[in-house]
Amino acid sequence: MKEYQVYLERARSRQQDFLYPLIFREYIYGLAYSHNWSRSIFVENGGYDNKYSLLNVKRLITRMYQQNHLIISANDSPKNPFWGYNKNFDSQIISEGFAIVVEIPFFLQLNSSLKEAEIIKSYKNVRSIHSIFPFLEDKFTYLHYVSDIRIPYPIHLEILVQILRYWVKDAPFFHLLRLFLYHFSNWNRFITTKKSISTFSKRNPRLFLFLYNFYVCEYESIFLFLRNKSSHLRLKSFSVFLERIFFYAKREHLVEVFAKDFSYPLPFFKDPNIHYVRYQGKCILASKNVPFLMNKWKHYFIHLWQCFFDVWSQPRTININQLSEHSFQLLGYFSNVQLNRSVVRSQMLQNTFLIEIVSKKLDIIVPIIPLIRSLAKAKFCNVLGHPISKPVWADSSDFDIIERFLRICRNLSHYYNGSSKKKSLYRIKYILRLSCIKTLACKHKSTVRAFLKRSGSEELLEEFFTEEEEILSLIFPRDSFTLHRFYRNRIWYLDILFSNDLVNDE
């Protein structure tokens, strides 16, 4: 967040409702440029690029205003001869500027809310993705029913802009934003297809992530308001921290905002044991009560999306299942609640009784098939999971090749170390290890056996399997029972702030 202090101090002297002048500030695009370079680990920063200069931005905006909207076609190629430049690259420049500017007022609100609530220190401790799973382990073992919900996309990007207008009132800024979206995302279509939204999100990830997260934040605000109104467990206040985006904390005044829409008595059933978890575009709703109440919440979700956000969702896409019989996918894991049955013999005087005890345990498993599919897509193995060489890396040195494979293996091992069964994780390590050996053999134009015999690389490649043990041995003796127990059990690393590309839900 430190990189935003430069323009945040300048923005504080202005009213937050007027963001249009900030679009024409040089330092905004300097920050956008540095943000793009900092996200890349394969390219060195060569300094400030002239393509991110304010002069080019002004020229692009002027051309947008002068462009005749009627001659824009939905099938415009990325390089339009009328424009005379690459629209994809220019779209990225302006969208980064839009994203930085529109984040300013919400980041200021987040800072003020954190200071008022005096939770600045605790805020740093709740950023981990893996903090969700200890919550699931504590709560879900007492619940019976779960609903796996995919949050629907809006049919048009105008819906996302309209939601944002409720919070930022700056007509010139939104006029320019609409003009930008019209040119770069085929807004002349009546309905924006999911494919075009996906294309726009890949070309302009930061702006789309902001707009989409704001839409999700608004939907969650109403949902939590309804949940507070229907539950015995009233929440005094709550905060919505959107992943990897520095947004704001919402408070109890949302009751006043939506009171006019829900002024009549709500026919709710009391459900004090409902739990809601979301990451990206997927959410899990679980409850202890009968399926009838879960079905009622399902229809509330559907009507909420249709009436307030004009988003259509089919009721059959939301299924209600028993936790003991259904696995749900979240954050790259398959999770379900297993019933462990044990029989205890109890004796009272001369009578003996057999007592059956049923305990529940949240079982979190590595999804081996999706992971192998992702590795096959990245050319580390075939679709059956057989390791193959990666010739595109053969130009690098042996050390760089091994380091690349080890980095991927460390990331996956670090992320999936909380799984209850490690066999699938060991198989992924095995695939990466053999793929690394085959890549080195391909580089040296040799067979795998001849390469290993000549170079003696077995000891070096043992790092694929021994790294976790070496880390734990710094804390526990290598021959201790504690080390063996910790190595076999799940360990949640709470410093993980993002999901690896290979474990995305999509």
UniProtKB/Swiss-Prot annotation:
The keyword Signal does not apply. One of its GO terms (molecular function) is RNA binding. It is found in: Plastid, Chloroplast. One of its GO terms (cellular component) is chloroplast. GO terms for biological process: mRNA processing; RNA splicing; tRNA processing. Pfam families: Intron_maturas2, MatK_N. Keywords: Chloroplast, mRNA processing, Plastid, RNA-binding, tRNA processing. InterPro entries: Domain_X (IPR024937), Maturase_MatK (IPR002866), Maturase_MatK_N (IPR024942). It comes from the Eukaryota. Its main location: plastid. Usually encoded in the trnK tRNA gene intron. Probably assists in splicing its own and other chloroplast group II introns. Belongs to the intron maturase 2 family. MatK subfamily. HAMAP family: MatK. This is Maturase K. It comes from Trifolium striatum. The gene is matK.
